[in-house]
Amino acid sequence: QQSIFTLWAPSADNIRLNLYSSGEAGDPEEQLEMDIADNGTWCIHIDRDLKGSFYTFQIEKDGKWLDETPGIWAKAVGINGNRAAVIDWNETNPEGWESDQSPELKMYSDIILYELHHRDFSIDPNSGIEHKGKFLALTETGTKTPEGESSGLDHLKELGVTHIHILPSFDFATIDERKLEKNKYNWGYDPKNYNVPDGSYSTDPVTPTTRI
């Protein structure tokens, strides 16, 4: 087993890889110097399986070590997105994912578009949706309000909606995922990790694979 880390940072003087056992607190268990490679990249090969570990990159420039970063290409992170995570991607795909296909669209003029915010869509106490404010709310069917009216996806189908435009789903900065009970709100236009789903919409922001 081998783990390979690569970072493009052509202006760096040195780069180190910080390895952690936690996605949130604690000092690094290891700090490893990376080697300069081709085309402005830095790389390190570690001869063991690091699944379950967390990591950051840290750049030295002009004698000063800059703040740690998970890297802009991180696809899995710990709580609040400060540390990237090493995961097994085979564990993230739901059943049937590889064979899933979108419906055929014959004419763009057939589109009836609905803009949707993950939290707003389901957070109302009377939505009848179990996973209020979460990604999973978009998987629930058969939900109803106390008055018996359809809610969630069923309501959109009744409206004749064919396509949903979802507001930012990526990991954004202003919601503290440790304090979701504070009910803080944001549309999501303050990106932190572009390639990671936001933890506040996950049922477990601590576990990297849960939000994916």
PLM regions: where:
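The feature marks proteins involved in alpha-glucan
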Residues: Q1, P28, I36-T141
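Short proline/glycine-enriched turn/loop motifs at strand-loop junctions of beta-rich domains
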Residues: W8-I15, L50
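Conserved residues at the C-terminal ends of beta-strands
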Residues: N18, R119, L167, P197
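Phosphate-binding active sites in nucleotide-utilizing proteins
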Residues: H118-D120, D124-P125, H131-E149, D154-H165, ...
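Structural beta-strand segments of beta-rich domains
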Residues: S3-T6
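Carboxylate/His-rich catalytic cores and anion/metal-binding grooves
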Residues: L156-N183
